[in-house]
Amino acid sequence: MGKVVQLFTHPLELKAALKLKFLREPLYPADDTQGSAELKRCYQLLQRTSRSFAAVIMELHPELRNAVMLFYLILRALDTVEDDMTISPKVKVPLLREFDQKLKLDTWSFDGNAKTEKDRDVLVEFSTILAEFHKLKPEYQQVIADITHKMGNGMADYILDEKFNLSGLETIQDYDRYCHYVAGLVGDGLTHLIMLAKFSSPGLYYDSPDLYESMGLFLQKTNIIRDYAEDLADGRSFWPKEIWSHYADDLASFSKPENATAGVYCINHLVLNALGHVQHVLTYLASLREQSSFQFCAIPQVMAIATLALVFGNERVLQTSVKIRKGTTCYLILKSRTFQGCVEIFEHYLRDIRKRLTVADPNYLKLNIEIAKLDKFIEEMYQDKLPVGAKPQETEIYKKVRERSAYDLEVLPREQEEEFKFNVLLSILFTVFGALYWYAK
């Protein structure tokens, strides 16, 4: 009931939710009548592990859809092994290090997870995943195997790292390294697949590792900030000591009411660190040349900037995991279909952060400088406010955005058609209710 009330008190979000549910047509709707029983089961497993990821994966271009789906399930299997505290390190560590070798087998499964582990079926039915994995193009298989190898070994290293297990992450460099293994590698693999499918230039993968690394780190750092209370309850922490030690002697002390102000300043410092990836994120999105891949990459990023704005200055983060409204999610999904829409979303939330920034915040100046730097970068993208007669500077990002804008124009007719249908339906509803009201009188 609360979510319904939220929608009706935010009309733009209500409109977006109705459009998304009833009017928007996917670019490449999946055909469930095609494919093997194994493939159908893989998509069922995907739906069970993550409905949100399943929704965006299902709308990918057919060239990439199965590859990305299997990539996700394989990494989910790896993560399910790593997360299960009931598995002995003597079993877990070698399994993580050798997990990529399992991809060479025709059949293999693992039934060693706790019965309460929600995603254990992915491992129990791993032979089903293998059957479809071996149908992928060899180059796609190689990308997935390489990332699985790197991620599995990274996970194993952290399990054996006594310093990490005792005191968490010490430095910002440690923080970046951890985020690389759990999210940066995903950006690496996805970008490699997108490049092999010819949905981006080869340079996006081979020449721009900082861009796809930032795509992963921006998402992971946002989640780490948001999940402070949840992680603390689980007896773990990922906020780096190099940042939190400025505000407390003990990370857990932020959860005490008397330390809420210090905790908020620490949150804002972490937000400042995450904002350092935004320029790379926008540059990456401007480099994509296929619409479904663009939407697949853009949606999580706009959710992340919205979440960063939500956690900024928000002491509730110290007590519970906060989430953006469902209606906001619907609005962002529709708005982020164009690159310009994504940029406008980032601009909106950056303004929101700056508006709520207080002079008392220790990072007041640094946050203002970072946001001003991003404002300037966004101006450079479009250069649409130049004096009469002035020519735009042909910078690399300006040229990227100009090329990307051609793809945005292809999306506009779809948006206009949805708006037309919505207005027609709204007119019909008003007419019907008006007639009923007149008749009742």
Swiss-Prot record:
Uppermost EC category: transferase
Gene Ontology cellular component terms for the protein in this record: endoplasmic reticulum membrane
Species per Swiss-Prot/TrEMBL record: Eremothecium gossypii (strain ATCC 10895 / CBS 109.51 / FGSC 9923 / NRRL Y-1056)
GO MF annotation list: squalene synthase [NAD(P)H] activity
EC id: 2.5.1.21
Protein name, UniProt field: Squalene synthase
Any one Pfam family match given in the protein's UniProt record, by short name: SQS_PSY
Membrane topology: Multi-pass membrane protein
Lineage: Eukaryota, Fungi, Dikarya, Ascomycota, Saccharomycotina
